[in-house]
Amino acid sequence: MSALKRMMRVSNRSLIAFIFFFSLSTSCLYFIYVAPGIANTYLFMVQARGIMLRENVKTIGHMIRLYTNKNTTLNGTDYPEGNNTSDYLVQTTTYLPQNFTYLPHLPCPEKLPYMRGFLSVNVSEISFDEVHQLFSKDSEIGPGGHWRPKDCKPRWKVAVLIPFRNRHEHLPIFFLHLIPMLQKQRLEFAFYVIEQTGTQPFNRAMLFNVGFKEAMKDRAWDCVIFHDVDHLPENDRNYYGCGEMPRHFAAKLDKYMYILPYKEFFGGVSGLTVEQFRKINGFPNAFWGWGGEDDDLWNRVHYAGYNVTRPEGDLGKYISIPHHHRGEVQFLGRYKLLRYSKERQYIDGLNNLLYTPKILVDRLYTNISVNLMPELAPIEDY
């Protein structure tokens, strides 16, 4: 009888433990599904701690070797003890002097004296009326936020595309920060906010494709920046022009502890020339909900023969504006789509997109509202 009671106690404990762990695991899965942004932030924070610990151990070992050796060799050159041969130093770049004279018929330099480096980022909420009032004093800003330097020829004509839904408090902060920085960089630019209406899950990639098509109808741009509304650069030397290869600008984000989450990470802020974006057939349209579209874009870029470049050192640092919105639901089908990125590249993108936009031109941006649905991007079997 006593043995039976002991067995029942053990069974009850096992049942309680099973219920506890089952409840915990299902709660975690539900949290990851309904709040992927928060869940991934926590995950990246844990990963970043491990990376930082390994880097610190590596640095300490490097310093011990320098101290214990009388001479150390770097790239075949002997350096006496005490010289700094750190792998982490970044060579400083020379920027033009304050008295540099621009010529209206010559291209604007990429390294201007106004570009001082570190930017003070203010993420305090501000109304659109206040921001409009501030920029109303600048008569050179045209409708849609269009601006062009007059003292030199802009090296790039940049369309900044911003996918949008229910982040109205972020937009004025974004413009207050970005407009002065792009003016310092002597780029021609304008902003396009592509707003998703309706009840379908958020489709960031499809919004970018819509924005690209509408921006090309508006002006003859040659560089396109794909920019999340809650990402603010911390360094004005992070030049928003394009290049021979696609560019990932937001290499170090504060919510990821300024560490690149993984090598193929291509999210937040990226830039491609118009030619590059057309060659890869744009973003995929099939990613509904959170996650996967940036990884697919990375694949498209590499399948087209390009490499991705990033800013050196701390130039690619960004601050993420805090928000109180519920995150978009996870797109659980993204892994299957990513397995077939190559097969889908030229049947899902700019070439299969249908939409009917509503366009409103504001003083600082062009608003493109569109109700997205899966049938607006029909895809053939692959």
Swiss-Prot record:
The keyword Transferase applies. It comes from Mus musculus. The chain crosses the membrane at residues 16-35. Its main location: Golgi. UDP-alpha-D-galactose binds at P163, F164, R165, N166, R167, F202, N203, R204, V229, D230, Y258, W290, H323, H324. Its EC number is 2.4.1.-, 2.4.1.274. The lineage of its organism: Eukaryota, Metazoa, Chordata, Craniata, Vertebrata. GO terms for cellular component: Golgi cisterna membrane. Belongs to the glycosyltransferase 7 family. Coiled coil: none annotated. This is Beta-1,4-galactosyltransferase 6. Disruption phenotype: Single knockout mice are born normally and grow to adulthood without apparent abnormalities. Decreased glucosylceramide beta-1,4-galactosyltransferase activity seen in the brain of female mice whereas minimal or no reduction in the enzyme activity seen in the male brain. Double knockout mice of B4GALT5 and B4GALT6 genes develop normally during embryogenesis and perinatal stage. However, they show growth retardation and motor deficits with hindlimb dysfunction at 2 weeks of age, and they all die by 4 weeks of age. Glycans are attached at N71, N75, N83, N84, N99, N122, N307, N367. Disulfide bonds join C108-C152, C223-C242.
